[in-house]
């Protein structure tokens, strides 16, 4: 380090606080910095910023900072007039004691209060992607050199290349998704996930039973994206009768900060999707989460959510307009034979090589460009599969079809209708039916039915119960209701 990086050493420069300031002058913003909202030091490794322990800062940076100051003190002592030599020697002796572990950690702790950063200061460029070989401008395709000032905590882990090594990845996609329009759509939704801002507010269901390759696609994309990909526990998306407390740690939320692509896999048969959680995670509102033993952090969402499953979750209200606008079902219709399915292991290994991950990253960037040029525009196969999903998972619709009559000239007190719904749910084996409040809200979405109020109470106009002896039970599409919650 050169002499002009710091001021000349004097008495004031040898205090603990002065040493902490000197540490940040030498290394702050370019090599290390402290984030006080999560209580962690960040270190720049030449590509991205990452959390490090306090001991790393003490041993690698504070110690070196003291060594540099000692060199300056010794140099000035040797060059000073004889009258000051003794004083400088005393300072030098005293300062050597700062090389012990306690003094180094004291210096680091003092440095933590010098212009600390927040985690929200990182990953703020949604149209840039940090790759192993540079900082990629998604809009122009220009690859720029890495800089600490880019404030990235994520990296793909592989290089961006403008042309693929081979056609292997694209050829496999043609086998897994033969329909060209659906394959083109998947290309665009995967590419759209590269942007660090939420524009579409959608969740993508990859649905299909058996060996169909959907898992290979999702996991290969995640492998190519490295730090930009994360896994969301499937239970987060499912309805539960137990609500988390306000102060409960939510690491699954905190882990989404800065992520572009998050996936969740395989719900059990009969699980019910949490509409409120899906709306929250796919919306554009600020998210707030907390890791264990840390303060909460707030951030704008940047992730795009993909859900792969053999058994799609049930819905409590299939007429919920917000959910219909969010859920897109991509059908995987090809089922490979057992012999063909055994290739998946080898295929997965092949797609995880560095060359293949670079090809997939190039394909994703190409998909982003297609998305920006064309928009998403779901093809008929996706529209049909999405419509079928809502029709087959319409609990309110099944209740009305089996137990009710819709007519302008009829009405029923709303508590009587809910009581009938609870009885129907019990007979259907639904263990966790809608609450009365959720049921009343769902009824507001039923065409031709409206909520009214009189002195006698609240009622629904346009609907009434069919006499019990005139009802014809229907079969629940997709199998038994007994496992529903």
Language-model features: locations:
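Active-site-surrounding "flap" and adjacent substrate/cofactor-binding loops of secreted or lumenal enzymes
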Residues: 62-66, 70
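Feature primarily recognizes SF3-like P-loop helicase cores of small DNA viruses
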Residues: 2-39, 70-485
């Amino acid at each position: 380090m050169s002499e002009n990086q710091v001021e000349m050493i004097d008495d004031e420069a040898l205090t603990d606080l002065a040493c902490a300031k000197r540490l940040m002058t030498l290394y702050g913003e370019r090599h290390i910095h402290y984030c006080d909202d999560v209580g962690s030091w960040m270190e720049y490794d030449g590509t991205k910023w990452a959390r490090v322990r306090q001991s790393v800062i003490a041993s690698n940076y504070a110690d070196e900072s003291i060594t540099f100051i000692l060199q300056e003190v010794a140099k000035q002592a040797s060059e000073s007039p004889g009258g000051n030599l003794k004083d400088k020697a005393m300072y030098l002796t005293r300062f050597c004691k700062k090389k012990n572990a306690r003094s180094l950690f004291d210096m680091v702790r003092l440095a933590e209060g010098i212009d600390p950063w927040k985690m929200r200061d990182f990953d703020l460029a949604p149209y840039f992607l940090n790759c192993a070989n540079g900082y990629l401008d998604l809009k122009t395709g220009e690859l720029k050199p890495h800089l600490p000032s880019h404030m990235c905590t994520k990296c793909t882990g592989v290089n961006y290349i403008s042309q693929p090594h081979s056609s292997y990845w694209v050829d496999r996609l043609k086998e897994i998704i033969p329909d060209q329009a659906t394959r083109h759509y998947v290309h665009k939704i995967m590419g759209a996930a590269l942007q660090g801002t939420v524009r579409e507010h959608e969740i993508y269901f990859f649905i299909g039973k058996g060996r169909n390759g959907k898992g290979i696609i999702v996991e290969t994309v995640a492998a190519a994206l490295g730090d930009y990909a994360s896994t969301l526990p499937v239970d987060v998306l499912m309805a539960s009768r137990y609500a988390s407390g306000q102060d409960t740690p939510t690491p699954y939320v905190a882990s989404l900060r800065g992520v572009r692509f998050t996936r969740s896999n395989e719900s059990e048969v009969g699980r019910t999707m949490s509409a409120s959680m899906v709306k929250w995670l796919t919306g554009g509102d600020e998210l707030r989460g907390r890791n264990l033993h840390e303060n909460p952090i707030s951030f704008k969402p940047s992730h795009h959510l993909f859900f792969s499953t053999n058994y799609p979750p049930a819905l409590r209200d299939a007429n919920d307009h917000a959910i219909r606008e969010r859920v897109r079902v991509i059908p995987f219709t090809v089922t490979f034979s057992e012999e063909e399915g055994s290739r998946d292991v080898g295929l997965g290994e092949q797609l995880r090589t560095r060359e293949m991950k670079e090809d997939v990253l190039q394909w994703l960037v190409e998909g982003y460009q297609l998305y920006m040029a064309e928009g998403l525009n779901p093809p008929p196969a996706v529209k049909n599969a999405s419509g079928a999903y809502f029709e087959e998972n319409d609990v309110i619709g099944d209740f009305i079809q089996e137990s009710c009559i819709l007519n302008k000239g009829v009405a029923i007190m709303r508590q009587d209708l809910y009581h009938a719904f609870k009885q129907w749910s019990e007979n259907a084996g639904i263990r966790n039916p809608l609450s009365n409040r959720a049921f009343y809200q769902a009824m507001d979405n039923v065409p031709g039915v409206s909520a009214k109020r009189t002195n006698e109470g609240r009622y629904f106009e346009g609907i009434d119960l069919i006499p019990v002896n005139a009802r014809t039970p229907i079969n629940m599409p997709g199998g038994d209701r007994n496992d529903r919650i």
